[in-house]
Amino acid sequence: MTTITAPVKRVPIPDEASAPFFDGALHGELMLLRCQACGTYQSPIAYIGVPLRARCVTCFSGELVWAPSSGNATLYSFVLMHQLYDEAFAAEIPYNIAVVETDEGVRMTSQVVDCPNERLEIGMPLEVTFERMSDAVAVPKFRPRA
């Protein structure tokens, strides 16, 4: 007898550079990079995999440290996906892909959850939540702020 298994969503594989981001997510904290020289927060995603060359986007300092964010954000932009590109998402069609802007000024791609797509509005206040994808990985998503 053949067993048919459902498609599984791809799970990010943390590396040395991204470990603080994913460790924070496992503990319920959204971690961002913060420049010690000028205080600018920036997205960690642009630097995952290239920690030795990471520079501040504002002053070009190499003094970047991981810091917890407030977890608050606003919806900057979004698109609704009606076409199936990955079988693992079949049960979620249509789903949203969102760009959120954290209170620290960092824009990141994520998803708004716990909200019908029809109620999504640019500028709506959001708060971070985390989807546990495995024992070792959780990813940030956002929901309407209470």
Write out the residue ranges for each language-model feature.
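A broadly conserved sequence feature marking short terminus-proximal activation segments
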Residues: 1-34, 146
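Well-ordered alpha/beta subsegment
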Residues: 3, 105-146
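Residues immediately within or flanking Cys/His clusters that coordinate Zn2+
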Residues: 29-32, 39-40, 50-53
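Conserved hydrophobic/aromatic beta-strand scaffold that supports enzyme active sites
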Residues: 32, 97-99, 141
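Short, cysteine/histidine-rich loop/knuckle motifs that typically chelate Zn2+
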Residues: 34-37, 55-61
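Short functional micro-motifs and their immediate structural scaffolds
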Residues: 43, 47, 61-65
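Extended interfacial segments that mediate partner engagement and assembly in macromolecular machines
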Residues: 63-119
